[in-house]
Amino acid sequence: MASYKFKTQNSFLLLLSISFFFLLLLNKVNSTGSLSFSFPKFKHSQPDLIFQSDALVTSKGVLQLTTVNDGRPVYDSIGRVLYAAPFQIWDSTTGNVASFVTSFSFIIKAPNEGKTADGLVFFLAPVGSTQPLKGGGLLGLFKDESYNKSNQIVAVEFDTFRNVAWDPNGIHMGIDVNSIQSVRTVRWDWANGEVANVFISYEASTKSLTASLVYPSLEKSFILSAIVDLKKVLPEWVRVGFTATTGLSEDYVQTNDVLSWSFESNLPGGNSVASVKNAGLSTYAA
């Protein structure tokens, strides 16, 4: 019965993903505002990515967000990676908002399954966004746990440690809007060392942000969604990327590795990425 439920849910997720992807392709016919890239694996020399703090690419082409020494993750590590080219998430002239899809695979592995911390996050942020000094439960996203609309951040978190002040019980996925306290969460049965495949989509017409995670080898899947008005939360131009942290004590550690990543956005009638300079933005400035 569990297997049937898994297959049914994942058939729905696959159909949803394919349908939304082709909708983006069709809409691009009448669109000049888009960003598209794909990293089947990563390279040591990756000029189209911005690396912050501990993040790096390993010799095996893995995007390692937090530090690993001699095969063991290090505590109090924090790292972020952003795609260098900004993209237009909404157009102040037309009022149009972009739709987007992204997919990536990651592995979180902990020496002790009962002591994991802290998490991995996909996020959108202002072009000049820098990584806060605080890691741990704030996941390299925010300076503190309070809501602040000036943060201008939307994120999907994969959180492996419960911070009592703002987290629900247990390991979870969450959607964050300007605060580390998620607007929507779902329980996530994290699988130690297993490859997780993630698909995230935003449909501008419905303002629906949806995230799904599948462990193909374990027949486990998870999905959550929330209504988020990106035009009210984010600036007109943003960058997209990942952030991750480990715990603040040496017992609570984990790896945070991204294996592959693709992204596609569509803004009807917007500016192309090549027009970024006309907006007064630098394509590759951190």
UniProtKB/Swiss-Prot annotation:
Residues bound to Ca(2+): D159, N163, D167
One Pfam family matching this protein:
Lectin_legB
Q: Assembly state and interactors?
A: RPbAI is composed of two polypeptides, A and B, that associate into five different tetrameric isolectins. The A4 combination is the only one devoid of agglutination activity. Isoform B4 displays maximal agglutination activity.
* Functional note: Bark lectins are storage proteins that probably maintain stocks of nitrogen during dormant period. Self-aggregatable molecules that can bind their own carbohydrate side chains. They could also play a role in the plant's defense against phytophagous invertebrates or herbivorous higher animals.
The domain of life is Eukaryota
Q: Where does the signal sequence lie? A: 1-31
What protein name is recorded for this chain?
A: Bark agglutinin I polypeptide B
Any single GO molecular-function term of the entry would be:
carbohydrate binding
Tissue occurrence: Mostly in the axial and ray parenchymal cells of the inner bark. Fewer in the axial and ray parenchymal cells of the xylem. Strong expression in bark. The lectin accumulates in the inner bark in autumn and winter and disappears in may.
Which ranges of the sequence are coiled-coil? none
- Keyword Zinc listed? The answer is no
| Alphabetical UniProt keywords | Calcium, Glycoprotein, Lectin, Manganese, Metal-binding, Signal
Q: Where does the record say carbohydrate is attached?
A: N148
Binding-site positions, Mn(2+): E157, D159, D167, H172
Q: Which family does it belong to?
A: Belongs to the leguminous lectin family.
Q: Does the keyword Metal-binding apply?
A: yes
